[in-house]
Amino acid sequence: MVVTALAFDFTNGFHDTGNAMATSIATGALKPKVAVGLSAALNLVGAFLSVEVAATVAKGIVNLDKVNIGPGDGKNHMLLLIVFCGLVGGILWNLLTWLFGLPSSSSHALFGGLIGAALISLGKDGVVWGGVVGKIIIPAVLAPIVAGIVSAIATALVYLITRKVEHEKQIKGFRWGQILSASLISLSHGTNDAQKTMGVIFLALVAYGRVNPEDGIPVWVKICCALAIALGTYIGGWRVIRTLGKGLVEIESPQGMAAEMATASVILTSSHFGLALSTTHVATGSILGTGLGRKNAEVRWGVAGRMVIAWIITLPAAAIVGALTYLLGHYIGLYNEVLGVIVVFIILVIAASYIFYRSLKTPVNANNVNDDWDDHKSSKDSRASKLSTCLLYTSPSP
């Protein structure tokens, strides 16, 4: 269970590296490998700064009052299976959207998986709907809008204030500023996203009877989650970095700094209040805002539209995966509880291996991440469009 949770944390790290470093890489403020190394180090530090979001995940999604702790050793196999299948849903969605370079929300993939598994096992009362709506869905809608507005205003002010500065000096100066602003995003990403995995592991520990629901997050959990997300970040999710850095808006350094400062401020504020924001949503909103704030900037609304479609279907798609894997694990588990988990884990490994194999056919790495978007746009956009269309037609009607 802990290994699977840390695997999710790892995919979260490399999937969401683009949130922090895409604009700095796109403008040349940081070399690609230096950028992901810096981001990894700061994600590691950020994971230790707060636990408010971890509390939201641990106690604000699955209704622990509806789960009866088992007798004897206190192990609750139902809760363990809910958590495990939620993680499987989150990991598979992360890998699938990474393959297509779609900056979807790792957080919502995890939440969707947990919600689906909880619904199928405990019914509608098994989900804390107040927490889901108040601390997940509403912030998901408002955060990119707020970030976009802040970023657009900041971009307009930056160009207004520096309008008399020579263009080359302006670009050079803001590149240095981007190093600071990108670092703040990485720090804020650690404070927000690593905590989500901490919350999941905490749920597993509750199921095992190792901790009480009222206890705090153990130190060893914080350390493991911090290391996993840092390692994933260092590996670098180049496909998503490319989409955010080159696919939405052609970004100059002043825009990059404005977008990054807007992203960092929104995420850090939300972490303080325990809001489980998607850093992907915030970063994307900020980047779009820079396109609106700079005169004559080109915004690729087609790419943005496909991202929004992926955002909308992330929760239900991951919930379906979580629910189906729970059913599979549960019914096999009627004969042998461990066997059910093993079968689901094998399916996860096979699916992940296939996705990785597919990614080798169209490699994106530090050497080509900054290539002009038009060089690959038609093939990449068509794949992303097919994914979005397929998922729309396979998602259940409300």
Summary of predicted features, one role per range:
Residues Y393-P398:
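Conserved small/polar residues in nucleotide/adenosyl-binding loops
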Residues M1-T389:
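Multi-pass alpha-helical transmembrane bundle typical of ion/small-solute transporters
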